[in-house]
C-alpha cells in the first residue's frame, strides 16, 4: 500500500514482477515464424507458453491480412519495439473482430492471465487502484496482441514513478480542411521552435492522420510541469502562425483548415500509439519513425504499413534509438516556472 494517498499530482505505483520461476526474454535467438496450418497454437518461448487463438481470422479482409500476420509482424519488430515500451503501464485497445470492427478500451489486466505477465498497479486520486499490464518481453507482447490489440498505447512515465515522464511531445492533428502538406509544414515549424530552445526532436508518422514529435527529457519534472510547458509552446506557435496552427483544444472552437498542435496528450494518464504500432486503418499503416529530411521531402502516412516496415528497419535500424540514450536527454529545468 502507498505511504500516502494519491492526489491530483501524486500517484503511488507498484510493479508486480513475474514469478521468479520464469525467465524474462526479449527476442528469441532466431526469427520466430508462426505456422500457417494452425488456427490455435500453444507457443513456447524459453519456457513460457503463449496461447495464440483464431490465427486465421481476417483483421483486414480487403488486404487479406489475418491475426496471424499481425502477430508475426510484432514478433519481427519486437527487437526494436520492446526497448521503447518496457516498464510502462499499457492501456489495451482491443479489436476482437479486426480493424473495421468495434473496439473497447481495457486498463485492468484480464484474469486469468499467465503468471509471467507483470503489472503496474497505479493508485488514482479517486481511490481506485488499476493493475495495468506491462509488456516486458516477446511473450507478453504476443499475449497482448492476441487479445485483439492492434496498436500499443503505453504511458510516457515508467512505472517506478508514474508522475515523471521521459518525454515531452506534440501530436499534430489536421483539423477538417487542413491538408497533409499543412501537417508537414507545421512539423517543420515545431522542429525549428524546438531547435531554437536547444531541444532535440524526433518525428514519427502517427499511422493515422498526423505526426508525433517527441523530445526526450531528463527525468525529474512532473507530468503537470511538462504539460504546462508543452501548452505554452503550442500557444506561442499558434499565435505566430495563426493561418496554419491552432492550439485550441475544444473542437467546437477550433478554426477550420488549421493543424492542431495538441499539447494535451502530455496530461497525466494520457497515451499515444507507440512507435512501430500498426494502426486500425484501411491500409494497416504503421506509426513509423522518420527523419526530418523525409519530412522535408513530403513523406506520407501510407508510405509505411504492416507489409513493408520490417524491411525499412532492416535497412535503417531504429531511428528512435537515440531516445533510449540517457546522455541525449534534454534538461527542461531552465524552462520550468
Residue ranges of predicted features:
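A short beta-strand motif that forms the metal-chelation/ATP-contact edge
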Residues: 212-218, 259-263
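Charge-rich, low-complexity segments
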Residues: 34-145
Amino acid at each position: 500500500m502507498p505511504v500516502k494517498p494519491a492526489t491530483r499530482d501524486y500517484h503511488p505505483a507498484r510493479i508486480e514482477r513475474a514469478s521468479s520461476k520464469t525467465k524474462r526474454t526479449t527476442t528469441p535467438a532466431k526469427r520466430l515464424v508462426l505456422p500457417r496450418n494452425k488456427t490455435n497454437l500453444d507457443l513456447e518461448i524459453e519456457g513460457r507458453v503463449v496461447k495464440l487463438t483464431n490465427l486465421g481470422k481476417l483483421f483486414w479482409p480487403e488486404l487479406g491480412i489475418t491475426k496471424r500476420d499481425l502477430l508475426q509482424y510484432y514478433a519481427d519488430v519486437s527487437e526494436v519495439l520492446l526497448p521503447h515500451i518496457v516498464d510502462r503501464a499499457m492501456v489495451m485497445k482491443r479489436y476482437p473482430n479486426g480493424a473495421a470492427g468495434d473496439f473497447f478500451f481495457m486498463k485492468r489486466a484480464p484474469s486469468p492471465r499467465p503468471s509471467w505477465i507483470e503489472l503496474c498497479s497505479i493508485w488514482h486520486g479517486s481511490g481506485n487502484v488499476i493493475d495495468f499490464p506491462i509488456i516486458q518481453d516477446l511473450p507478453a507482447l504476443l499475449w497482448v496482441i492476441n487479445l485483439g490489440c492492434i496498436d500499443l498505447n503505453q504511458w510516457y512515465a515508467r512505472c517506478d514513478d508514474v508522475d515523471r515522464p521521459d518525454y515531452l511531445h506534440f501530436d499534430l492533428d489536421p483539423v477538417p480542411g487542413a491538408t497533409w502538406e499543412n501537417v508537414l509544414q507545421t512539423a517543420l515549424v515545431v522542429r525549428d521552435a524546438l531547435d531554437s530552445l536547444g531541444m532535440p526532436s524526433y518525428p514519427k508518422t502517427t499511422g493515422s492522420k498526423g505526426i508525433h514529435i517527441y523530445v526526450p527529457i531528463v527525468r525529474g519534472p512532473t507530468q503537470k510541469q511538462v504539460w504546462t510547458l508543452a501548452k505554452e509552446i503550442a500557444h506561442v506557435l499558434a499565435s505566430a502562425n495563426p493561418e496554419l496552427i491552432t492550439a485550441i483544444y475544444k473542437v467546437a472552437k477550433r478554426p477550420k483548415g488549421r493543424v492542431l498542435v495538441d499539447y494535451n496528450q502530455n496530461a497525466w494518464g494520457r497515451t499515444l500509439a507507440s512507435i512501430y504500432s500498426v494502426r486500425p486503418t484501411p491500409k494497416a499503416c504503421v506509426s513509423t519513425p522518420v527523419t526530418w529530411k523525409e519530412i522535408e521531402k513530403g513523406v506520407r502516412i501510407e508510405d509505411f504499413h504492416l507489409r513493408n516496415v520490417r524491411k525499412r528497419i532492416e535497412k535503417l535500424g531504429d531511428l528512435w534509438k537515440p531516445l533510449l540514450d540517457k546522455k541525449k536527454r534534454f534538461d527542461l529545468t531552465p524552462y520550468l516556472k
